[in-house]
Amino acid sequence: MIYAMSDIHGCIGELQKNMEQVDLGGDNRIVFCGDYIDYGDSSYYVLKYLWDLQKKYGAEKVVVLKGNHEQMFLDWIEDYRNIYSDGTEDCRTFNDWICTDFEYGANTISTFISEQQMDFLNQIARTCSMETISREAVRMILSNHEKLIWWIQQMPLYFETKSQIFVHAGVDEEAGEYWMWGASDNTLLGKFPATKGKFYKTIIAGHVGTCSRDLAADRSYHDVYYDGESHYYIDGSVYKGGKLLLLAYDEENEKYYQVENGRMVLVKPTGI
């Protein structure tokens, strides 16, 4: 059995509940398809949970792919790591990520630092620029979690089997079986809109909510989306009140199931 989850977005309770339904015995394994941070209130704890799980079972059994939110987080850290290390500020600064995080009450940053450190950031935010806040926050995060940040940096962008490609957003399907040779990080992490139709391998991805206009086109739909051809989308918009979806692929009968509340329901083409 191969399990898959994506777009956890800081929702540790939902992750733990889903993992109670995962059997990692035998040859079973699980692939996490990115976007573990932001929006929810437990970003660091989600990453730590996955890191510990991978250390327990090994990287072949627990595959943790990178999402665009992890990459934005890393870009922000790298920019301000450079500023902090050489004392200059004449380089590009990636403020999009931290601005979004502060719009959500600093839900992500606050989980990586102590309460006292967060109080300090809130205090200087009254008079200091976002650049100054970022510089201090990066210094704190690297001091607290340098090994974890290194682990995030090493996350692969896709995982391939004989018949499947697990990825955060998608691949360049126009390239056919040569997709990996021209695959840009932007495509793998941020492809939009979601692709549907026939491909030579099955694509399992997140990134785009299954309720979105490009998929089910139904705001109340938060189950696995299957296009009836080659694509399974598993972002159930958990942080918006949807679901953290758990997909299971039975390698013996080559069928996909949505696992929920202890039941395995065969995934059928959506809307048909």
Labelled PLM ranges:
Residues M1-I272:
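Feature recognizes metal-dependent phosphohydrolase scaffolds
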